[in-house]
Amino acid sequence: MTTQRNTDKPHSKPEDQWNMYNRNPKFKATAKRCSPNLMKDGFQSLSSPVCIEASAVPLPPDSDDEIYFPVPEQTTKESQHEQKVSMKLHEEQDVQAAEHTLYNQYEEKIRPCIDLIDSLRALGIEKDLSLPAIAVIGDQSSGKSSILEALSGVSLPRGNGIVTRCPLELKLKKIPTSQEWKGKISYRNISTDLQHASEVENAIRNAQDVVAGTKGNISGELISLEICSPYVPDLTLIDLPGIARVAMRNQPQDIGEQIKKLIKKIISSKETINLVVVPCNVDIATTEALKMAQEVDPKGERTLGILTKPDLVDIGTEEYIISIVQNEVIPLRKGYMVVKCRGQRDIHNKLTLASAIHQERQFFETHKCFSILLDQNKATIPHLAMKLTNELVAHIIKTLPTIESQIREVLQKSVQELQKYRRGTPTIETEKLAFLTDLIKLFNQDVSRVICGEEHLFGNEIRLFAKLRKEFQTWGLLLLENAAKVQKSIPSKMWKYEDQYRGREFPGFINYRTFEDIIKEQILDLEEPAIVILNNVIRLVEEKFLELTNKHFANFKNLNRAAQTKIDVIRNTQAMNAENHIRNQFKMERIVYCQDNIYLDDLRSTKAEILGKDSGKEISFASVSDKNAIFIQEMISHTKAYFTGASKRLSNQIPLIILSAVLHDFGDNLQSSMLHLLQEREKLNSLLQENSEAAKMRNYLSGRVNRLSKAYQCLKDFSCL
């Protein structure tokens, strides 16, 4: 069915509408302080109340507070007429001045919030994070398009089946009455200026054909429509395709699931306010739109319900509709509103949008049941516009700190990622060697920083030395556990000596061979755990060096592979050297030796410590006689004294061996080996062969860093307002 476009000025009002507002006591005070230009579009309640709620802008005094000036009594009708004309002129000047002040303060407080998010969305920030938005969803024929038409003042595509086939960003901007209507539609790299409201419908249809094709398919690609008019609220909405249950001809059979998937992707974001449109003449509990909103917002914290078609409700069900709007049936934190927009018959009869708003108010004013909703500001398009603007601005202010934090974090990560793709391979042969030299130089610098424990960190990264220290702390705990194990095993070993090996010696004489055996056995138990620590450290160091190759050579697969091969070869060599060194250390440890003065100092300290404790709590002597307790205690003192020195030695020596061979020598040899690549001139072109995806990734990351930097600057500029 073809629709008649409205070629009149958007939102042009019938002449008697001003009188209608004056007749309504609720709007009487407002009418006195608003110019006819603001009144004629039906949005007069938006100009003042929005400022009250969102920016606390003081309004001119109400009618009760009006100031009256004494007027001397006139003697002639002509003088009285002149006085009336003069008073009317002054009144109009006062109204215009008040309007100008309100508009300027409104522009300073409200418009920047919405413009900020619009500018971030225009930069493409939604590719990186979610932005505050109001998404409009509803089943087919729910009245969704009619609401958007009433808010925007323009006709949108209508027809059978799925008409909205792409997300439509509808940016409404209120401008002074002195300026003319203008619009702009943008999609992909196309941007078209619109000179008249009548051009909007065809412009949207053409844009959808380009983005989604001409066969009824849908697309998740955004189309942006900007409308600047004196007769629209300051608001940005995202219109989504209506939820379909049956595919039309030429449409995929799963078109319904495609639409639901697209809708769910957008309304799932916690930054999105979901505007759910439901007709009054259907069971609200069964509507697919509300069901989807409840799935992503179970508590209803960011869902606003809009009831349409109140003129089609069955007689006797009005109270049920009122209970829904009063939030008594399916509670939503943001509540419900009800509106009456143009129907298909109204469009066929060429009813203008302005007249439809006029008829909507008359409907609610005269309805015996629904008039109470008008008194509560829960009905009509103007009140809906006011509600949506306030909700959006409050939501933007609430989420700005989170948005700034997310942009900062994503920007930092993107800059770090871009370092891998800093620039492409030179085309001039003489520059290639210098380019490779720079790459290897930067890589070697990072290796040196790792060796010194001074590498640059991003986010929650942990320095390699911090990881190695944990491994060496584990080694220290193993030594303590081994020393405790020795003390517990001494009584049984001494009993074995008494029972099997003591010959003509008197009881109480310490056998040095037994002492040596105990020491050697416990030292031997530490050798394999030391090798485990070595392997753990090798793995951590290798992972760090491989991470550096991916950081510097990610887009040069041959160079990256060459560096990884060198890391693997050097790793094996250094691991073998370190293991041999550790095993030699334990071979020496099996020689029981200590300087006399050091040993005697440790022995005195050990005996003093033991005497200061209740020896019965230290060791159980149930397996030996009391007469042997003294020389067992003596053996414990000697072994503990020796292990004190040996543990100190091993606690430092094993980590030093590992750090020397596996970190320092590994890193130094890797740097030297990478420099050798510069001498292999015949491999130069092969080493610098760039991956096919590298240039694409570089461009992507550069664009991302660019838009995030601009977005961050926008937020900084906004915070200075």
Curated annotation (Swiss-Prot):
Basic and acidic residues: compositionally biased ranges: 1-16
GO biological process, one term: defense response to virus
InterPro entries for this protein: Dynamin, Dynamin_GTPase, Dynamin_GTPase_CS, Dynamin_N, Dynamin_stalk, G_DYNAMIN_dom, GED, GED_dom
Keywords (A to Z) from UniProt: Cytoplasm, GTP-binding, Nucleotide-binding, Nucleus
Segments of this protein annotated with the region G5 motif: 340-343
Dynamin-type G domain sequence ranges: 128-401
Domain GED per the UniProt entry, residue ranges: 632-721
A Pfam family recorded for this sequence: Dynamin_N
Induction comment: By interferons.
GO cellular component: a single term: microtubule
UniProt region (G2 motif), positions on chain: 163-165
GO MF entry, a single one: GTPase activity
Keyword Transcription included in the entry's annotation: no
Entry superkingdom: Eukaryota
Keyword flag Nucleus: yes
Region listing for Disordered, in residue ranges: 1-22
Region (G1 motif): 138-145
Family: Belongs to the TRAFAC class dynamin-like GTPase superfamily. Dynamin/Fzo/YdjA family.
Protein name: Interferon-induced GTP-binding protein Mx
Organismal lineage: Eukaryota, Metazoa, Chordata, Craniata, Vertebrata
